[in-house]
Amino acid sequence: METLRYRFDGQRGARAGLEHALVGVVASGNLEVLVERVPLEGAMEIDILTAARGFGAIWQAVLDDFAARHPLRDVRISINDVGATPAVVSLRLEQALDVLQGADA
């Protein structure tokens, strides 16, 4: 297992909604995403536990894209990954954010 941690400067808070949201499932080719509202001095933190070692540059690219589209303040995202593709990672991140902000996933 490899642990990765990223931190992004936030520009806006997540819309009103739940305090946390959990989407996905930890299974082969998939991942679980937990999003929580926490005081982080205006930052967004993303912690990843993955079975796929050596893909830090790909994770960085996917998360840079997500953070550019959603520069959220005071949000922690925890990802438990079992080899999901970048497209699945992006999908689950969007789903988790939708649930957190009160939309149906």
Swiss-Prot record:
Localization: Cytoplasm
Q: How is it modified after translation?
A: Covalently binds the prosthetic group of malonate decarboxylase.
Hey, what's the signal peptide range on this chain? none
Domain of life, per lineage = Bacteria
Classification via InterPro entries: Mal_deCO2ase/Cit_lyase_ACP (IPR023439), Malonate_deCO2ase_dsu (IPR009662)
Keywords assigned by UniProt, alphabetized: Cytoplasm, Phosphoprotein
| NCBIfam families given in the database record | malonate_delta
Name of the protein in its database record: Malonate decarboxylase acyl carrier protein
Its taxonomic path starts at:
Bacteria, Pseudomonadati, Pseudomonadota, Gammaproteobacteria, Lysobacterales
